[in-house]
Amino acid sequence: MFDQQRDGNLYKIWNRLCSGTWFPPPVLKKRIPKSNGKERILGIPTVSDRIAQGAIKLFMEEKLDPIFHADSYGYRPGKSAHDALKQCAIRCWRYSWILEVDISAFFDHVRHDLVLKALEHHGMPKWVILYCRRWMEAPMQSCENGELITRTRGTPQGGVISPLLANLFLHYAFDLWMEREYRGYRLRGTLMIL
Protein backbone atom coordinates (compact mmCIF):
# COMPACT_ATOMS: atom_id res chain seq x y z
CA MET A 1 0.00 0.00 0.00
CA PHE A 2 2.80 2.45 0.89
CA ASP A 3 4.63 1.66 -2.35
CA GLN A 4 1.60 2.42 -4.52
CA GLN A 5 1.94 6.11 -3.59
CA ARG A 6 5.61 6.04 -2.66
CA ASP A 7 6.61 9.51 -3.91
CA GLY A 8 3.70 11.24 -2.18
CA ASN A 9 4.23 9.25 1.01
CA LEU A 10 7.96 10.05 1.10
CA TYR A 11 7.19 13.73 0.52
CA LYS A 12 4.75 13.73 3.47
CA ILE A 13 7.35 12.13 5.75
CA TRP A 14 10.03 14.62 4.68
CA ASN A 15 7.67 17.59 5.02
CA ARG A 16 6.46 16.59 8.48
CA LEU A 17 9.96 15.80 9.76
CA CYS A 18 11.25 19.17 8.52
CA SER A 19 8.34 21.12 10.01
CA GLY A 20 8.36 19.36 13.39
CA THR A 21 4.91 17.91 12.82
CA TRP A 22 5.81 14.22 12.61
CA PHE A 23 3.88 12.37 15.29
CA PRO A 24 4.49 8.64 15.26
CA PRO A 25 1.39 6.48 15.22
CA PRO A 26 1.11 3.76 17.87
CA VAL A 27 3.47 0.82 17.43
CA LEU A 28 1.85 -2.58 17.01
CA LYS A 29 2.37 -4.83 20.02
CA LYS A 30 3.29 -8.30 18.78
CA ARG A 31 4.13 -11.24 21.03
CA ILE A 32 6.93 -13.48 19.74
CA PRO A 33 7.56 -16.85 21.43
CA LYS A 34 11.09 -17.47 22.73
CA SER A 35 12.84 -20.84 22.86
CA ASN A 36 12.60 -20.90 26.68
CA GLY A 37 8.79 -20.80 26.57
CA LYS A 38 8.55 -17.10 27.45
CA GLU A 39 7.54 -14.30 25.08
CA ARG A 40 9.32 -11.27 23.69
CA ILE A 41 7.17 -8.20 23.06
CA LEU A 42 7.94 -6.36 19.84
CA GLY A 43 6.72 -2.85 19.08
CA ILE A 44 6.40 -2.71 15.30
CA PRO A 45 6.19 0.77 13.75
CA THR A 46 4.31 1.57 10.54
CA VAL A 47 6.23 1.67 7.25
CA SER A 48 6.17 5.48 7.27
CA ASP A 49 7.47 5.63 10.82
CA ARG A 50 10.24 3.12 10.03
CA ILE A 51 11.38 5.40 7.19
CA ALA A 52 11.28 8.48 9.45
CA GLN A 53 13.23 6.65 12.18
CA GLY A 54 15.76 5.42 9.63
CA ALA A 55 16.45 8.95 8.40
CA ILE A 56 17.04 10.29 11.91
CA LYS A 57 19.06 7.21 12.88
CA LEU A 58 21.48 7.81 10.00
CA PHE A 59 21.99 11.39 11.17
CA MET A 60 22.50 10.37 14.82
CA GLU A 61 24.62 7.29 14.19
CA GLU A 62 27.32 9.28 12.44
CA LYS A 63 27.77 11.38 15.58
CA LEU A 64 27.14 8.80 18.31
CA ASP A 65 28.77 5.61 17.05
CA PRO A 66 32.35 6.92 17.42
CA ILE A 67 31.85 7.48 21.17
CA PHE A 68 30.83 3.88 21.86
CA HIS A 69 33.31 1.48 23.41
CA ALA A 70 35.43 -0.40 20.87
CA ASP A 71 34.29 -3.67 22.46
CA SER A 72 30.58 -2.87 22.13
CA TYR A 73 29.36 -5.01 19.22
CA GLY A 74 25.56 -5.09 19.32
CA TYR A 75 23.63 -3.19 16.63
CA ARG A 76 26.70 -1.32 15.42
CA PRO A 77 27.62 -0.60 11.79
CA GLY A 78 30.60 -2.69 10.71
CA LYS A 79 30.47 -4.86 13.86
CA SER A 80 28.91 -8.27 14.34
CA ALA A 81 28.51 -11.19 16.71
CA HIS A 82 31.35 -12.86 14.81
CA ASP A 83 33.66 -9.95 15.70
CA ALA A 84 32.71 -10.36 19.36
CA LEU A 85 33.42 -14.09 19.18
CA LYS A 86 36.86 -13.39 17.69
CA GLN A 87 37.65 -11.17 20.68
CA CYS A 88 36.41 -13.92 23.01
CA ALA A 89 38.76 -16.39 21.36
CA ILE A 90 41.69 -14.01 21.76
CA ARG A 91 40.95 -13.05 25.35
CA CYS A 92 39.78 -16.39 26.73
CA TRP A 93 43.41 -17.53 26.91
CA ARG A 94 44.27 -14.63 29.23
CA TYR A 95 41.56 -15.15 31.86
CA SER A 96 40.25 -18.16 33.71
CA TRP A 97 36.68 -16.93 34.11
CA ILE A 98 33.73 -15.53 32.15
CA LEU A 99 30.70 -13.73 33.53
CA GLU A 100 27.63 -13.80 31.31
CA VAL A 101 24.61 -11.65 32.18
CA ASP A 102 21.30 -11.33 30.35
CA ILE A 103 19.44 -8.05 30.87
CA SER A 104 15.85 -9.20 31.19
CA ALA A 105 13.42 -7.19 29.02
CA PHE A 106 16.09 -4.52 28.55
CA PHE A 107 14.36 -2.59 25.75
CA ASP A 108 11.21 -2.39 27.89
CA HIS A 109 12.98 -0.66 30.79
CA VAL A 110 15.26 1.98 29.22
CA ARG A 111 14.71 5.24 31.10
CA HIS A 112 13.58 8.01 28.75
CA ASP A 113 14.99 10.83 30.86
CA LEU A 114 18.49 9.34 30.82
CA VAL A 115 18.47 8.75 27.06
CA LEU A 116 17.29 12.31 26.43
CA LYS A 117 19.94 13.67 28.81
CA ALA A 118 22.63 11.72 26.93
CA LEU A 119 21.38 13.08 23.60
CA GLU A 120 21.58 16.62 24.98
CA HIS A 121 25.07 15.92 26.34
CA HIS A 122 26.22 14.97 22.85
CA GLY A 123 24.81 18.13 21.31
CA MET A 124 22.00 16.53 19.36
CA PRO A 125 19.76 19.21 17.83
CA LYS A 126 16.47 19.91 19.58
CA TRP A 127 14.51 18.41 16.69
CA VAL A 128 16.36 15.08 17.09
CA ILE A 129 15.61 15.04 20.81
CA LEU A 130 11.97 15.92 20.10
CA TYR A 131 11.53 12.99 17.72
CA CYS A 132 13.40 10.55 19.96
CA ARG A 133 11.09 11.53 22.82
CA ARG A 134 8.03 11.04 20.62
CA TRP A 135 9.24 7.62 19.45
CA MET A 136 10.00 6.42 22.96
CA GLU A 137 6.64 7.69 24.25
CA ALA A 138 4.53 6.49 21.30
CA PRO A 139 1.74 4.28 22.63
CA MET A 140 1.69 0.57 21.91
CA GLN A 141 -1.44 -0.91 20.36
CA SER A 142 -2.39 -4.50 21.11
CA CYS A 143 -2.93 -6.56 17.97
CA GLU A 144 -5.34 -8.79 19.92
CA ASN A 145 -7.91 -6.20 21.06
CA GLY A 146 -6.70 -2.81 19.77
CA GLU A 147 -6.09 -1.49 23.31
CA LEU A 148 -3.69 1.48 23.47
CA ILE A 149 -0.98 1.14 26.11
CA THR A 150 0.78 4.28 27.36
CA ARG A 151 4.52 3.87 27.82
CA THR A 152 6.67 5.81 30.28
CA ARG A 153 9.78 3.61 29.97
CA GLY A 154 11.47 1.65 27.27
CA THR A 155 12.00 1.94 23.57
CA PRO A 156 10.11 -0.44 21.28
CA GLN A 157 12.06 -3.55 20.40
CA GLY A 158 11.32 -3.57 16.69
CA GLY A 159 11.83 0.15 16.15
CA VAL A 160 14.58 1.23 13.76
CA ILE A 161 16.04 3.78 16.17
CA SER A 162 15.64 1.70 19.35
CA PRO A 163 18.97 -0.19 19.14
CA LEU A 164 20.91 3.08 18.81
CA LEU A 165 19.07 4.59 21.80
CA ALA A 166 19.67 1.38 23.77
CA ASN A 167 23.39 1.48 22.93
CA LEU A 168 23.56 5.12 24.06
CA PHE A 169 21.86 4.22 27.34
CA LEU A 170 24.21 1.26 27.94
CA HIS A 171 27.22 3.39 27.02
CA TYR A 172 26.62 5.46 30.15
CA ALA A 173 24.89 2.91 32.38
CA PHE A 174 27.35 0.09 31.76
CA ASP A 175 30.21 0.53 29.29
CA LEU A 176 31.91 3.50 30.94
CA TRP A 177 31.75 1.77 34.32
CA MET A 178 33.10 -1.45 32.80
CA GLU A 179 35.88 0.46 31.10
CA ARG A 180 37.03 1.73 34.47
CA GLU A 181 36.65 -1.58 36.29
CA TYR A 182 37.25 -4.34 33.70
CA ARG A 183 38.20 -5.00 30.12
CA GLY A 184 34.98 -6.24 28.57
CA TYR A 185 32.51 -6.08 25.82
CA ARG A 186 28.80 -6.13 25.23
CA LEU A 187 26.86 -8.07 22.61
CA ARG A 188 23.19 -7.01 22.30
CA GLY A 189 21.41 -7.70 25.59
CA THR A 190 23.97 -10.27 26.71
CA LEU A 191 27.05 -9.11 28.57
CA MET A 192 30.29 -11.00 28.82
CA ILE A 193 33.23 -9.79 30.87
CA LEU A 194 36.62 -11.18 29.91
What are these regions (language model features)?
Residues F2, D65, W97:
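Metal-dependent nuclease catalytic cores that hydrolyze phosphodiester bonds in DNA/RNA
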Residues L58-D71:
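Charged boundary/loop elements
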Residues D49-A52, E61-K63, R94, K117-H121:
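Short, low-complexity, polar/charged sequence segments that are solvent-exposed and flexible
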Residues K12, R16-G20, P24-R31, S35, ...:
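Conserved polymerase palm-domain catalytic core
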Residues I41-L42, T46:
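Conserved phosphate-binding loops in nucleotide/dinucleotide-binding enzymes
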Residues K38:
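Exposed loop/turn and edge beta-strand positions of beta-sandwich/beta-sheet ligand-binding modules
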Residues M1-D7:
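Non-catalytic, polymerase-adjacent accessory regions of viral genome-replication enzymes
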Residues V47-K57, A89:
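Duplex nucleic acid-engaging cores and interfaces of nucleic-acid transaction enzymes
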